[in-house]
Every structure is written in structure tokens, then in C-alpha cells.
């Protein structure tokens, strides 16, 4: 990796080789938004609890946390900057721009629905290159923070890609092309992941800068293998400590399978601890004993070793892959004429053209 490769944190760009053990998809502060309609546990605004959680992560050897809260879906630039400043020189915080799944946006009046794609791309590029809007593009005022986004989020729903989600995927791909910023996509219960990868690449995104999340909720190792081999993207397994979906042993076995197939360069890990009772220190504020970010080190990494995943592969998954994937690419010029014919036809079918 070239020495000038960098990862964009909220406190500035850092050398990619310095980011250390990285949690590639997590949450520390979630300041309201549509997720709260699903469960009140999605409201996470306790800065002190979040700081304690980061400290435990650091104490276990963690160095970088990528927080995947896009504008209007929990993102809080003020509080996240406070946390980042508290750990300056000890831990890196990366924040996101972009969108979540279409269910979180009004299909008629949201700016994702109303604003032309070209203009939304400009808005996202500004968040990466100039600074995130402290008001989350709620309008009519835009106030740029000193903190810039270091990753682009998109999202898709269960077993279908909504027309607004395809629009958000195009925005993500074009923003990534223009800025070099990496992409991570929420795939609901791990569905439509292959199609998501194909569409992003069809728009021109670099597959090495794409991560797909929540595939662990669709426990099919052959599906994972197919996605990686056919598209070259990376799967971010974000679900240790989710026994309601599957035991940790199943996820560990799936990772071992992929490693044995020579695909360890296409795996990253995280906790996706985006609810109060998914973090130890938030749980304590509710009078509950729960697990937290330290679970990765105390329980899941030992399990990976137990099932036979080598230390070399673990180092790739936790350190080497994130620093390559999260490092900004060389910016390119978006060329609409090079978009795949399949994506162009899908845009026509979904009346996006």
C-alpha cells in the first residue's frame, strides 16, 4: 500500500497503515430519527456511556471505529466530535454520509425523492470534502462542521430494491468515484446483496472500496462465496452476539469456510451495536448487564481461533483489510456513458430516467 494512502476520520486524515484494529460498522451516538419508530432502544445520546464503551474497546487493543449513521438517521456531529476529541491520539472515529433503506424516507416529499440525483451527489461530495452539515441537511440552513465524512452509506430493504434505494446506490457510487471515499451498504437481513454489489459496480464504483453489511443474518456461506468471487466486494460480518438470529459458532464456521476458500481478503468484522442493550455501558444506565464492544475481543476472536481461523487471517480481517478498503481511492471523473446497460435499463424500469 502506498504511504500516501489515508483514511478520513472526524479529526482529519490519518495514514491508512496507522488505523490498527478496526470495527468497520458500529454506532456510538444515535440521535433520534426513523429507527425510533421500530424500537426506543435506538435512541443513544449518552456521551459518557459512549466514551466508556470506546475506552473498553481501546483497552482491548482496538484503534478505529467506523460509525454508520447517515444524515437524519441518528447522526450527531456535535456529540461525535466530543467523543473523538476525548480520544485524540488514542482512537480514530470515522463518520458517514449517505442514506439508509427507503423505508426511512417519504417516497414523495423527502429530499431523496425530490432532489435530482446530480444535486444530491454534490451534497454528498461536500460532506466528504468540505465538512458534514451539522443540521443533517434538514434545511433550509447548511452549517459545515470541521468534521468530514469518511465513508458513504446506502441501504436496501428486505428482498427488494426500492427505486429510491437504487437512486441512493447511484449517489453512493458517483460520490465514491468523485472523492475516492469508500462505501458500506445496509442490506436488510442480508438480502439483495449480490444485486447491490452488481449495481454499484455497474455505476462505476471500485469493488475494493465496497462493503456489504448484515449478510450474517442470511446464513448462507455459499451465497457469501458467490458474491465475493463474482464481484470482488467485501462482506462486513457485523453480528457476533446476535443469538436471536444465529449462534456465534455458525458465523465463526462461515468465516472459517471463506478463509479456507482463500477469501480472507474480502472479510471485515464489527459489532453493529446500535441499540442501548447492545452496549455494556449504555446497558448499565438502564440497570442491565449486557455485552458491548469488548465482546469482539473477549468472546468472538477466541471462538474464531477455536474453529481454526489462523492469526494471519484474523489480522487481515481486523487490520489489513480495513486499512486497504477504508483508504481513499484516487478520485475519478464519473462517466455516464460507461454505466452498465443493465443498470440503465433498471433505472428506466423504475422510472428513474
From Swiss-Prot:
InterPro entries: Metal_Hydrolase (IPR032466), PhFuoseLconase (IPR054957), Phosphotriesterase (IPR001559). GO terms for molecular function: 1,4-lactonase activity; zinc ion binding. Zn(2+) 2 binds at residues 153, 186, 214. Transmembrane segments: none annotated. Zn(2+) 1 binds at residues 25, 27, 153, 272. Binds 2 Zn(2+) ions per subunit. The keyword Zinc applies. Pfam families: PTE. The modification N6-carboxylysine is found at residue 153. Gene3D superfamilies: Metal-dependent hydrolases. Its EC number is 3.1.1.104, 3.1.1.25. It comes from the Bacteria. GO terms for biological process: catabolic process. Its cofactor is Zn(2+). Substrate binds at residues 244-245, 275-278. Catalyzes the hydrolysis of D-xylono-1,4-lactone-5-phosphate and L-arabino-1,4-lactone-5-phosphate. Also able to hydrolyze carboxy 1,4-lactones. Belongs to the metallo-dependent hydrolases superfamily. Phosphotriesterase family. PANTHER family: PHOSPHOTRIESTERASE-RELATED, PHOSPHOTRIESTERASE-RELATED PROTEIN. This is Phospho-furanose lactonase. It comes from Mycoplasmopsis agalactiae (strain NCTC 10123 / CIP 59.7 / PG2) (Mycoplasma agalactiae).
Amino acid at each position: 500500500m502506498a504511504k500516501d494512502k489515508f483514511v478520513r476520520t472526524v479529526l482529519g486524515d490519518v495514514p491508512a497503515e496507522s488505523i490498527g484494529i478496526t470495527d468497520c460498522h458500529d454506532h456510538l451516538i444515535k440521535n433520534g430519527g426513523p429507527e425510533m419508530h421500530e424500537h426506543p432502544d435506538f435512541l443513544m445520546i449518552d456521551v459518557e456511556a459512549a466514551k466508556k464503551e470506546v475506552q473498553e474497546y481501546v483497552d482491548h487493543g482496538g484503534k478505529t471505529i467506523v460509525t454508520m449513521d447517515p444524515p437524519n438517521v441518528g447522526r450527531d456531529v456535535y456529540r461525535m466530535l466530543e467523543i473523538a476529541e476525548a480520544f485524540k491520539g488514542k482512537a480514530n472515529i470515522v463518520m458517514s454520509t449517505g442514506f439508509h433503506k427507503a423505508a426511512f424516507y417519504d417516497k414523495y416529499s423527502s429530499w431523496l425523492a425530490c432532489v435530482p440525483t446530480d444535486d444530491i451527489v454534490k451534497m454528498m461530495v461536500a460532506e466528504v470534502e468540505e465538512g458534514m452539515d451539522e443540521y443533517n441537511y434538514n434545511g433550509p440552513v447548511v452549517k459545515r462542521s470541521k468534521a468530514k465524512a469518511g465513508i458513504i452509506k446506502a441501504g436496501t430493504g428486505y428482498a427488494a430494491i426500492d427505486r429510491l434505494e437504487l437512486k441512493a446506490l447511484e449517489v453512493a457510487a458517483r460520490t465514491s468515484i468523485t472523492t475516492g471515499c469508500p462505501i458500506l451498504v445496509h442490506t436488510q437481513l442480508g438480502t439483495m446483496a449480490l444485486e447491490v454489489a452488481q449495481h454499484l459496480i455497474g455505476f462505476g464504483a471500485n469493488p475494493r472500496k465496497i462493503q456489504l453489511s448484515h449478510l450474517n443474518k442470511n446464513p448462507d456461506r455459499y451465497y457469501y462465496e458467490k458474491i465475493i468471487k463474482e464481484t470482488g466486494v467485501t462482506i462486513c460480518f457485523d453480528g457476533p452476539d446476535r443469538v436471536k438470529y444465529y449462534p456465534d459458532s455458525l458465523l465463526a464456521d462461515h468465516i472459517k469456510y471463506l478463509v479456507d476458500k482463500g477469501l480472507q481478503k474480502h472479510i471485515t468484522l464489527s459489532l453493529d451495536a446500535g441499540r442501548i442493550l447492545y452496549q455494556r455501558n449504555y446497558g448499565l444506565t438502564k440497570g442491565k448487564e449486557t455485552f458491548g464492544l469488548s465482546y469482539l475481543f473477549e468472546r468472538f476472536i477466541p471462538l474464531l481461533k477455536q474453529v481454526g481461523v489462523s492469526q494471519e487471517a484474523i489480522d487481515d480481517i481486523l487490520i489489513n483489510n480495513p486499512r486497504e478498503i477504508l483508504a481513499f481511492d484516487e478520485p475519478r471523473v464519473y462517466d455516464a456513458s460507461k454505466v452498465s446497460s443493465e443498470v440503465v435499463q433498471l433505472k428506466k424500469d423504475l422510472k428513474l430516467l
